[in-house]
């Protein structure tokens, strides 16, 4: 299948995955003060409306936790583009959040679901980092493959699928699908490597 078709198909899988990744409230140590917002407690508990959180963020744009909560509201509303932007901002303004593994996965999933192609490379980088911290987590594995395919990082996708195979029952349909995927990815990785060699020749 074409790369374009593969990317479109990613959205369906990632839409399901992001529900799992972002399900439940985001708990973060060291809740910030929200004195400017009358319903501060609701925001801190994740119960405020998207509008209330957005209004609060205008007065506290560096509150990473609030950006994450705002992203969750946007995910619930199906606005993955806004969610991706909010999560990216959260990571930029709050170093602790930038290191949060679940936020890394949420960001990657939101970018892929929104088909923010300009951010595919960044999403792949972030998800790759998360995978390095939680390689045995099925969410990280699946999203790492999806992000690598979206970013056309074929060699990395091959590495992840190869690592997954030993943990899949060899007589299962999932194993056969994984093997077929691996063959496809290996072919694309080889083609990309050959193309790169051609480009560097004088």
Residue ranges and their predicted role:
Residues 50, 54-57, 84, 91, ...:
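Tetratricopeptide repeat
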Residues 46, 64, 80, 117-120, ...:
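TPR-repeat structural position
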Residues 111-120, 152-159, 183-202:
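Alpha-helical linker/edge segments of TPR/alpha-solenoid repeat scaffolds
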Residues 61-62, 95-98, 135, 169-170:
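Short coil turns that delineate tetratricopeptide repeat
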Residues 66, 99-103, 140, 174-178:
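TPR alpha-solenoid repeat register
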Residues 91-92, 149, 154-172, 180-183:
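TPR/TPR-like (Sel1-like) alpha-helical repeat modules
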Residues 36-41, 72-76, 81-84, 88-133, ...:
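Alpha-helical adaptor scaffolds
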Residues 1-51, 55:
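Long, contiguous interaction/recruitment modules in multidomain scaffold/adaptor proteins
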């Amino acid at each position: 299948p074409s790369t374009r078709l593969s990317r479109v198909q990613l959205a369906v899988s990632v839409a399901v995955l992001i529900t799992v990744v972002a399900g439940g409230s985001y708990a973060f140590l060291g809740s910030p003060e929200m004195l400017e917002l009358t319903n501060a407690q609701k925001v801190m508990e994740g119960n405020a409306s998207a509008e209330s959180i957005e209004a609060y963020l205008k007065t506290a744009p560096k509150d990473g936790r609030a950006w994450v909560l705002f992203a969750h509201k946007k995910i619930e509303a199906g606005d993955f583009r806004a969610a991706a932007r909010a999560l990216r901002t959260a990571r930029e303004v709050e170093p602790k959040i930038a290191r949060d593994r679940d936020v890394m996965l949420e960001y990657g999933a939101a970018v892929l679901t929104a088909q923010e192609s300009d951010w595919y490379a960044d999403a792949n980088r972030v998800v790759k980092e998360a995978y390095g911290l939680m390689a045995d987590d099925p969410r990280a594995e699946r999203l790492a493959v999806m992000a690598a395919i979206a970013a056309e990082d074929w060699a990395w996708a091959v590495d992840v699928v190869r690592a997954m195979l030993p943990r899949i029952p060899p007589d299962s349909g999932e194993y056969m699908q994984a093997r077929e995927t691996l063959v496809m990815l290996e072919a694309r990785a080889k083609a990309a490597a050959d193309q790169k060699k051609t480009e560097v020749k004088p």
